[in-house]
Amino acid sequence: ENNERMLSMDRPQYVNWIVREAGVVFEDQQPLNCYRLSYVIDDAILDDWALHIRRHYVPDDELEEDAALNKLTVEEYLRQYVIPQKGEPFGPTARSNDISEILFADLFEFILNYEVPRCKQHNRSGKNESEHGTDIIAYRFFAEGKAPHKNDELVAIEVKALLSSNEAGKVIKDAVTDSKKDEDRVSHTLNYYRKKLRFMGKSTEA
């Protein structure tokens, strides 16, 4: 049951804040599909969002067991071994990257109706070390029953995060440039996900 959450997440409440912005174009007048968070300060929704993010790293029962085995409280274990911290080398970058990737995974799954494996942050070798390969993979089957079809979709997603909007144009260009690498990386990422999902007990999805 816990590993099932790593592949198929419950819809977090904050997703209702995601709205599409119309009429956005890039420098060359190329239209862009843009979304923004139209949020309000709501502690219950923010707490639910935080729990949603944490479950990408470690499911509930596994967290309690790991903390107990290390003779730490749950909060101590998360800070020391799981969640990137701002005072650590590469911690802020790792945390920004993780949250951005989870946000885009939620967009593709809950707004655009793709299936998105949730295993990248799970049990990685270092909490401040992002996994290599394609940032996010999303897919959608055309036929019922997931029978192979020529109209099946596989999307390789390159995620870039920026704290300021001043260099948004450069970030978009960088994402386009780096996305071309995914033609080479996506097959390796698919194989990595297949093996990791099998390790997590999700042989059918793998």
Model-derived segments and their meaning:
Residues E1-E75, V82-K86:
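Nuclease-adjacent, charged terminal/linker segments that flank catalytic cores
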Residues I111-E129:
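A short acidic/basic microdomain associated with nuclease active sites
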Residues Y139-A156:
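Active-site beta-strand-loop-beta-strand hairpin of nuclease catalytic cores
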Residues S165-A206:
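Acidic, metal/cofactor-coordinating or nucleic-acid-engaging core segments within structured domains
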